[in-house]
C-alpha cells in the first residue's frame, strides 16, 4: 500500500512565464509473514484481512486450485467469509494482456470496493499478471500475495514489479504496485515438482553469489538434498536440512529486501540482483520451446562467471566452484543456440534497458559484486568461446535437466486449442461484441494466425512427471501426481 504527500509552489521561468512546481513523496508500506499451512482453520492471519469485507475474490492457477482448492474453500467457510475464485491458466506464453483482462472481468463482476484487496495465490507468473491487473483496475486496487513456488517465495514476492509479456519481450508492459501483505508459506513446496524446485534454486544462487557468502556456502553444502527434499519440506527430511533450508530461505528473502527496497522503482540501474539478467532475457525465448527462467539466468550467470574469471575478478578455484554448483543442481550453463549472434543481439537489447550502459553484475569475489561497463564485443566473444570449451568437461555439455518449459510454464491445451489462442479469441470476441465487428482473432503480426507454441506437453495436466533418474519423487506423505503447474495431488501408492 502507499500514500502520497506533495507540496505545490508557484514558479516563474527565466523567460517570465508563470507556472507551478509539484514536489511529492510516496510512502510505501507492505509486510511479510512467514507462516506454515496458511489455509489451516486455526491460522486466522489471512481471514483477519478479509473480516472487514466479509468476502474475498481470489485469483489462482487452475492446477493450484486442483491441489488446494478444497482447503481454500473450507478455510473461508470456517471463518464465515464468502469466497469467489477466478481460476486462470497462466504460463509464459499466456502471460499476456488477454489473460490480464480475463482477471479484470472477474474483478468487475465481483464489484470490488475501492480498497478491498484481491487475494493472489500462485507462482511468480500468477502474481505478476494478477498484480498488474490490480495496478490497472481503477488505477490502484489492493492485493494480498501468497506465492507457491520457490521463485515466487524467494524472488517475485520481494519485488513490487508486476507485468505481462508483449510479443517476444518479457515483462515489457507493467507497473510498480506493492501488495498490502505477503504470506510466505514454504509448505507449498511439498507439492512442487523437482523441476520447479531446481528452477527456483537458480534464484538463490543469484542472490548469494553476488551478495551473501554464508548463504552460498549453505547452498553448496546441501545442494542435492535441498532439491530432492523440497527444501526440507518433504517426508523424511533431517532436522539439519530443515534448519539449513529455513536459514537459506529467510536470509535469501532478507537479502533481496535489503538490496531492492532502497530502489523499488529501479531508478538506480546498477542492481546486484541483476546478476544473470544481462543476456538471459533474450536467450530465454530463443529456443522454439523456451528455457525455464531459472535455467536461462543460470546460463547467463555461468557465462558471466567465465567473463569475470578472464578478468581475474574471481579465482580459478571460485570459478570452478560456481560452475560445479550449477552442474550439481542440474541447472543449465550453456545452450547450443547461445552463440555470438545471440550474445550481440542480447547486448544491444539490454543497453537500451539500462540507459546505454551494460551494467553487467559479476562476482568479485563470490559473495560480493562489481558492475562491468567496458566489455568489448571481442572480449565477450573470447569469453564465450572459452566458456563453450569448458562446458565440454561437464555432463550434457553444460545443458540442464528439465531445462525447457512445459505445460506448467507455457499455458495449457484443451480440446486441441492452446490456452493462448483461447484467451486471445475470447478477448477478440468480447471486443467484437462491443464494437459490432466479428471479433476475428488477430495474432501479434496481424495475420490472424495464432501459433500453438505449447509443443512439449499437450494435455499435460494430471500426468505424472519423473525426475532425471526416471523415478517419481517421494512426497511429504505419499507419492505425488504432478499437475501442469509443477504442483501435485497426493495419491495413495498402489498396494502390493
Language model regions located:
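Short active-site segment of divalent metal-dependent hydrolases/proteases
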Residues: 127, 131, 280
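ATP/NTP phosphate-donor binding region
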Residues: 2-117, 493-496
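Acidic-aromatic/histidine active-site loop/patch
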Residues: 124
Amino acid at each position: 500500500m502507499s500514500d502520497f504527500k506533495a507540496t505545490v509552489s508557484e514558479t516563474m521561468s527565466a523567460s517570465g512565464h508563470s507556472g507551478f512546481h509539484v514536489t511529492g513523496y510516496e510512502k510505501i508500506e507492505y509486510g511479510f509473514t512467514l507462516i506454515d499451512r496458511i489455509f489451516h482453520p486455526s491460522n486466522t492471519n489471512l481471514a483477519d484481512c478479509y473480516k472487514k469485507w466479509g468476502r474475498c475474490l481470489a485469483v489462482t492457477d487452475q492446477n493450484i486450485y486442483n491441489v488446494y482448492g478444497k482447503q481454500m474453500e473450507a478455510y473461508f467457510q470456517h471463518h464465515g467469509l464468502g469466497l469467489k475464485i477466478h481460476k486462470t491458466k497462466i504460463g509464459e506464453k499466456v502471460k499476456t494482456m488477454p489473460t490480464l483482462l480475463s482477471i479484470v472481468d472477474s474483478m468487475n463482476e465481483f464489484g470490488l470496493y475501492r480498497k478491498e484487496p484481491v487475494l493472489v495465490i500462485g507462482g511468480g507468473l500468477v502474481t505478476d499478471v494478477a498484480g498488474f491487473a490490480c495496478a490497472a483496475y481503477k488505477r490502484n486496487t489492493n492485493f494480498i500475495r501468497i506465492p507457491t513456488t520457490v521463485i515466487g517465495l524467494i524472488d517475485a514476492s520481494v519485488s513490487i514489479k508486476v507485468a505481462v509479456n508483449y510479443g517476444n519481450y518479457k515483462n515489457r508492459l507493467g507497473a510498480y504496485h506493492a501488495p498490502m501483505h505477503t504470506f510466505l508459506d514454504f509448505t507449498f513446496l511439498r507439492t512442487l515438482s523437482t523441476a520447479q524446485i531446481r528452477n527456483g534454486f537458480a534464484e538463490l544462487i543469484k542472490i548469494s553469489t553476488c551478495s551473501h557468502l554464508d548463504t552460498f556456502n549453505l547452498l553448496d553444502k546441501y545442494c542435492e538434498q535441498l532439491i530432492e527434499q523440497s527444501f526440507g519440506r518433504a517426508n523424511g527430511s533431517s532436522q539439519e536440512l530443515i534448519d539449513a533450508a529455513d536459514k537459506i530461505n529467510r536470509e535469501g528473502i532478507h537479502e533481496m529486501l535489503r538490496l531492492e527496497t532502497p530502489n523499488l522503482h529501479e531508478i538506480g540501474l546498477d542492481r546486484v540482483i541483476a546478476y544473470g539478467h544481462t543476456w538471459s532475457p533474450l536467450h530465454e525465448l530463443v529456443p522454439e520451446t523456451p528455457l525455464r527462467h531459472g535455467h536461462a539466468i543460470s546460463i547467463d550467470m555461468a557465462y558471466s562467471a567465465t567473463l569475470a574469471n578472464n578478468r581475474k575478478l574471481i579465482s580459478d578455484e571460485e570459478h570452478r566452484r560456481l560452475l560445479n554448483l550449477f552442474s550439481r543442481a542440474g541447472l543449465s550453463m550453456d545452450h547450443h543456440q547461445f552463440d555470438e549472434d545471440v550474445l550481440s543481439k542480447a547486448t544491444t537489447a539490454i543497453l537500451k534497458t539500462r540507459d546505454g550502459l551494460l551494467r553487467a553484475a559479476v562476482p568479485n569475489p563470490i559473495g560480493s559484486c562489481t558492475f562491468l561497463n567496458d566489455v568489448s564485443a571481442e572480449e565477450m566473444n573470447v569469453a564465450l568461446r572459452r566458456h563453450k570449451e569448458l562446458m565440454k568437461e561437464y555432463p550434457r555439455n553444460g545443458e540442464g535437466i528439465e531445462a525447457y518449459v512445459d505445460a506448467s510454464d507455457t499455458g495449457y491445451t484443451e480440446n486441441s486449442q492452446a490456452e493462448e489462442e483461447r484467451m486471445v479469441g475470447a478477448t477478440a470476441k468480447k471486443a467484437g461484441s462491443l464494437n459490432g465487428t466479428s471479433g476475428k482473432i488477430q495474432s501479434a503480426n496481424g495475420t490472424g494466425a495464432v501459433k500453438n507454441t505449447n509443443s512439449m506437453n499437450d494435455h499435460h495436466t494430471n500426468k505424472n512427471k519423473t525426475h532425471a533418474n526416471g523415478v517419481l519423487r517421494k512426497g511429504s506423505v505419499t507419492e505425488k501426481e504432478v499437475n501442469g503447474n509443477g504442483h501435485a495431488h497426493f495419491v495413495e501408492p498402489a498396494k502390493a
